[in-house]
Design a protein with these regions (language model features):
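N-terminal strand-loop-strand
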Residues: 68-114, 118, 140-141, 164-168
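A gly/proline- and charged-residue-enriched helix-loop-helix capping module
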Residues: 15-58
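Acidic, metal-coordinating catalytic segment for phosphate/diphosphate chemistry
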Residues: 40-90
């Protein structure tokens, strides 16, 4: 990136190299500059894709790198294999001057986070926003507005960011019904 080369080591044997250090992939999230974080996440994403697609899922033949674009190709059956990118949403749910923040249940990540989740087959991103908010905190939303997106290579995702308003009925108390399997607080 720019004039800096980044490398990923996949082996178990760590080589001592002056000026270099080994870091857990998930701990790179807090690193700076953010271009280095993007490089690490993208490298991780591609490494996982290469490792899990060494053989064709249709016929079992060893795959080869395509010379024209980022894909693998099966020389036997001709199947084309592209990197897997799972669409997901991350949602800022606003209620007046408040925003819903959660902490995940049963995960290593313990900081506050916005509601997030994967888009299912046949579902638009906006439908995902509605479903995820309803599943995780039990409220309806309105005025869903796209904000921006970012690659999230740690989990092979493309995160699409949205803001929306909590749709609390007149006289409703706005009580949240938390899915304790997903959300701790």
């Amino acid at each position: 990136i720019e004039d800096t080369a980044y490398f990923m080591w996949n082996g178990d044997n760590r080589l001592a190299a002056p000026g270099y250090e080994y870091r857990s992939m998930y701990k790179t999230r807090a690193c700076y500059p953010k271009t280095a974080v993007l490089a690490a996440a993208t490298g991780w994403h591609l490494s996982l894709w290469y490792r899990t697609n060494r053989f064709c899922g249709a016929c079992g033949e060893r795959t080869v790198h395509d010379e024209k674009e980022r894909m693998l190709r099966c020389p036997s059956c001709g199947r084309l294999i592209f990197p897997v990118i799972a669409p997901a949403v991350i949602v800022g749910v606003i209620d007046g001057d408040r925003i819903i923040l959660t902490t995940y249940a049963g995960r290593e990540y313990k900081r506050y986070a916005l509601i997030a989740g994967f888009t299912e087959i046949g579902e638009s991103a906006e439908q995902t926003v509605r479903r995820e908010v309803m599943e995780e905190v039990g409220i309806s939303v309105k005025n869903i507005t796209y904000y921006k997106s970012q690659p999230w290579g740690y989990d092979s995702n493309l995160l699409m960011g949205y803001f929306c308003q909590a749709d609390i009925p007149e006289g409703g108390d706005g009580h949240l019904t938390i899915d304790r399997q997903e959300i701790a607080t």
